[in-house]
Amino acid sequence: MRTPLMICALMASFSSFANCLSITENKEITGQFNHDKALCFSTHLQSQRYAELDVKGIQNLQLANQDGTHIRRLLKDVPVDGQQQKIRFLLPETANYQFIAQGEVGVQWHITLKTYPYQPLDKDAGIELTSPRLQMLAQDLTASNIQLFWQQIQQEGTPLVEPYDNHNKRVTFLWQGAQSNVYLLGSPAGDHDPLTRLANSDIWYRSYIVPNDTLMQYKLAPDVPVIENATAAQQRRAILTTAQADPFNLHPSPSKADDRYNYFSLLSLDYPRECQLPDILDRAMNGNTSISRFHSEILNNDREIALYLPAQKMTTPRLLVLFDGQIYRQQYGIDRFFDKLIEEGKLPPIAILFVDSIDSDRRSVELPPNPDFHRFLADELLVWLEQEKGLQVAAKETIVSGSSYGGLASAWVAFNRPDRFGKVLSMSGSYWWAPENEAPEWLISQYQQADKKPLQFFLEAGLFESREGTGGILNNNRQLKQVLQQRGYPVQSLEMASGHDYISWCEALYIGTKALTND
């Protein structure tokens, strides 16, 4: 399960390569993977530039230095039939680099490299200093005091947490030493918030007042570059070029990966949690998870399906169908988590069907209301589960669940196939969505207008998923709850002091499943 094992295996597979393929800027090279399923490209790159790769047909890709030492994972487990990927990243220094690639035998690969002058955005939020500890430091901002401050922070960990009142804490996110900007990805404001520099020091900060039970993942992005000729959306995504785990945070989430760009940092204020990562990832299971490759005639594609079966006998067969299954299972260990909960008697025995979303392009087509997708689930996948796995579950004991677009999809699938899916566990559902030329909150309107169906609901949304006015996922979910209650549906809900992230959804999965199986 640990990613570094994959990295080591990849590196070892290249030890027999005497030479890498040379890659030059602005020139596409292409070829096919042979029986080794791996290859490398070499190039000389300059610092103070950011790189852009366009790749297709490559499943895994790492940036390494000349001797093969890993620097950054750029792609992981991309489907070989997926769309072209565009990747941006900064170069640590002027040097010779390798791109180490992995793919399937016979698959055609394409790769193009471009680099651009690196100019970081000039963005200082200029916000008021409200942290008492930083205010005290600002009164005597000497080099020795700044050095002592960072030494203390390294020992204590970040973010800086200070008292505020009986129900809230003041939390200050910190960064040391950026040139022109630092952004917070996953902020309590639900946006990419810029930090402020403390005078002329190397201290960047941003403070928030948050509830005492706050749970959230975040990254920090120093010196985000200006993207040439970019749209507003493209420039916004530039934060991913440098976004990384907080170097002073002591709690990697879900676990520490092979490089700082590929995991989050955790803020979990004092509050009892069931989803304790990364401990869950190393737990031995009593139950069993089997992996299958499933072809859909309706969707004309293939995907991974994983089925978890508990060790305990299900006197009443129960099933949780979970979208974005690979992420939930591989990165967050939901099968191990539920195995633990079942063993401890906190959940009844329940099977889990993890449905992979293949890639982001197909996810954005399949999960927003799509008639073919609910047909695939009801008429192909559940039939396969019954015929091939011998598991038949009544609709009233079948929960369909997902997060973001997956939350939207769960409510849509149940709306159309209540004969198969009787319960909805929606987390941060994207109920703002509407088909082209339709009003926002389209699915909410469908529930408002249609006859009542035999369904039960559990809706979760984060308090940090709001926007000014009436927008935002939090408000959309509140609107759906109100409509469902007016129509007479059984509805339970949860509003966590959290954002749009998997660590909060891990907790919500337990709470929601417990609520929907507590008959």
For each feature predicted by the language model, list its residue ranges.
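Edge beta-strands of jelly-roll/beta-sandwich modules across compartments, strongly enriched
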Residues: G103-T115
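N-terminal signal peptide c-region/cleavage motif recognized by signal peptidases
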Residues: S13-S16
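Extracellular Ig-like/FN3 beta-sandwich strand-entry sites
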Residues: Q48, T94-N96, D213-Q217
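Exposed aromatic-hydrophobic patches
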Residues: F41-S42, Q84-L90, W204-I209
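Acidic, Ser/Thr/Pro-rich low-complexity intrinsically disordered segments
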Residues: F33-R72, G82, P92-E93, E104
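Non-catalytic extracellular/lumenal accessory regions of secreted precursors
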Residues: A18-A38
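Short beta-strand segments within Ig-like beta-sandwich modules, predominantly Fibronectin type-III
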Residues: L75-G82, P194-N200
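Non-catalytic cap/lid and distal C-terminal segments of serine-dependent acyl enzymes
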Residues: G126-D191, A199-V210, T214-D519
